[in-house]
Amino acid sequence: MNSGDATRLHCSNAHAKQTLATLFANRNHSSFYEYAIAFVSTLLFKNNLNLMTACNLINSLINFELNMFGKSLLLNGFVNFCIANSDGVTIQHKMLTNVLSFLLEKYY
């Protein structure tokens, strides 16, 4: 075996390790995303939270996700959800409008 073969084998192993690490990170990110959505849904729809508490919880989850994964699917999901569901006259619509305003001011 010459040195070129050894180098090639090493690069193949490095690529395999990188691929596995990427798959592992993607799996963890999707698991985090599922748990975070379930957590926020439970808090918002089964508990009586004021607006600032809800915004602080969402902000904490987004910051945690940004620090762990370098991007935030939650931020995009929350903004899209608020945009789609904040046009109305009920208290829920007003709350979603305020959450959207908070997210846009903080992150965009």
From Swiss-Prot:
InterPro entries noted in UniProt: AcMNPV_Orf4 (IPR009946)
Family matches, as Pfam families: DUF1477
Domain of life: Viruses
Protein name, entry field: Uncharacterized 12.2 kDa protein in EGT-IAP1 intergenic region
Lineage, broadest ranks: Viruses, Viruses incertae sedis, Naldaviricetes, Lefavirales, Baculoviridae
